[in-house]
Design a protein with these regions (language model features):
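Long, basic N-terminal domains or extensions that often function
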Residues: 1-2
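Noncatalytic, beta-rich nucleic-acid-contacting surfaces in large DNA/RNA-processing enzymes
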Residues: 202, 258-259, 274-275
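A cross-family structural signal marking well-folded subdomains
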Residues: 30-34, 38-249
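Flexible loop/turn segments at secondary-structure boundaries
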Residues: 9-13, 24, 277-279
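Histidine-centered nuclease catalytic patch
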Residues: 263-294
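Short cysteine-rich loop/turn motifs with clustered Cys
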Residues: 246-269
Length: 294
């Protein structure tokens, strides 16, 4: 049987869907936002076809199962303060629709399409610039996504203004990777590591000039702490620490290659893949004496 149910307003339809939904799952934030965009378009006498097209593009790029994750990271990428409390869910986007876009659902949809393109580009490391591609590959090997919002924020600002260019992005990602990795090597907890992420977000989203963005990042640099951490035992049998060791080894391997080359390893990675027991590679011969190698 097919049952047709009609309600008087969207709020009632959302509640009814939760009751009747055969999956037993509530509507996701992505479901609610999509319907709210259609409702806003109807209220402002805008054609819904553009919203449908934009949303289809987002789903094709990001994937339906990752939509809520993308929307969360996108919302984080828009933060203008260091408050770690993120306004949750659907209401945050509705507030943004009214305040930033004056109810223009089409403009907001197109903005989300652009952000989804940048998010996908980061996940797939689809950059032609060799230095940028190398830094993104290194950050991706950590197996976390806390570094993605500031990178998205920089790319989104590049797309909507002429403040930054590709060379600026290369310098930004180089500075950010170095300082962010300081926190990992010093075994900082997540909230401490994220401080540089939030500082970068505040600088980018409050329209600070490029030099100020870099200065905000470099304020979190700790070269002496980083050097001291190198003498500590890095390995611990925890997933994050294992990912860190893997990321460091692969980053060392990248530095031995031409910038245009990023090798991919499958299966188990051991230290001998990167730091050979035999001192035969020119890279190591030029940098270490035999007694240092031993």
């Amino acid at each position: 049987y097919i049952v047709f149910v009609q309600t008087d307003d969207f709020a009632s339809s959302f509640r009814l869907f939760n009751v009747l939904n055969s999956r037993g799952l509530p509507l996701s934030n992505a479901d609610l936002l999509k319907n709210a965009l259609f409702e806003s378009a109807s209220t402002h006498n805008k054609k819904s076809e553009q919203i449908e097209s934009a949303w289809s593009q987002i789903e094709d790029m990001v994937g339906v199962r990752r939509l809520d994750k993308f929307l969360t990271l996108h919302k984080l990428s828009e933060k203008k303060d260091r408050d770690r409390v993120l306004q949750k869910g659907f209401e945050a986007f509705i507030e943004n629709l009214q305040q930033q876009f004056d109810g223009d659902a089409i403009a907001m949809s197109l903005m989300l399409v652009n952000s989804a393109k940048n998010y996908t580009k980061i996940l797939e490391n689809d950059f032609e610039h060799p230095s940028i591609r190398r830094k993104i590959a290194s950050l991706s090997n950590l197996g976390v996504d806390e570094w993605i919002p500031p990178v998205m924020a920089f790319m989104n600002r590049m797309a909507r203004t002429e403040d930054f260019n590709l060379d600026d992005f290369s310098q930004f990602i180089t500075a950010f990777e170095k300082v962010y990795m300081h926190g990992w090597l010093k075994k900082q907890i997540k909230s401490q590591r994220e401080m540089v992420c939030y500082s970068a977000l505040v600088a980018i989203n409050n329209d600070m000039p490029f030099d100020s963005v870099i200065n905000q990042i470099n304020q979190h640099a700790d070269n002496s702490g980083f050097i001291a951490a190198l003498d500590e035992d890095l390995y611990e049998p925890r997933p994050n620490q294992v990912n860190l060791i893997k990321a460091i080894l692969l980053r060392l391997d990248m530095e031995q290659q031409d910038e245009s080359v990023i090798k991919t390893y499958t299966g188990r990675i051991t230290i001998e893949h990167i730091l050979p027991q035999a001192l035969v590679n020119e890279y190591w011969i030029n940098r270490f004496q035999p007694q240092e190698h031993v």
